[in-house]
Amino acid sequence: MTKHLTTLAAGFALSAAALQAQLPQSRVLTLDLAQQIAQETLAKCTADGFKVTVLVVDSMSAAKVMLRADGTSPSTAKVAEMKAYSTMMYNRPSGPAQPLPPGQTAPPATIPGTINAQGGVPIKVGDVTIGAVAVSGAPGGDKDAACANFALAKLADKLK
């Protein structure tokens, strides 16, 4: 009886290991990392003289962190949300200057909740998008995007 139980237990252990090997592995955007990205992005824009809102979302487009600089227009929060959603929807930086993904025929502005404005940048671990950082409030989306890209470059070692 003991021999059968030992064999059965070994079989379960092997089955569990095989099942685990088949499960997809994924990275999750932690709150700590989201806060660091938001803070670095806001610090860069502030140093450049811009009052902005920074929004960091996870892979499901759910807000993790939002920071609004003092004196920032309330509308920047909604625009940042739309930039983040656009980034996650198309898995690329937001903005009209970006080419559409292969097979995509509709420009991003035709999808409700998206916007044709730069400032949304994917947060990637390798080729996997784990979230997005979106910025609104600088005088031009290129400046919004530059702040986000600066923060992601600064924190690149944490995105491995």
Where are the model-predicted features located?
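Bacterial N-terminal signal peptides
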Residues: 6-20
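Flexible, solvent-exposed loop/hinge segments and secondary-structure transition points
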Residues: 20-160
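Positively charged n-region of N-terminal signal peptides that target proteins for export
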Residues: 1-5
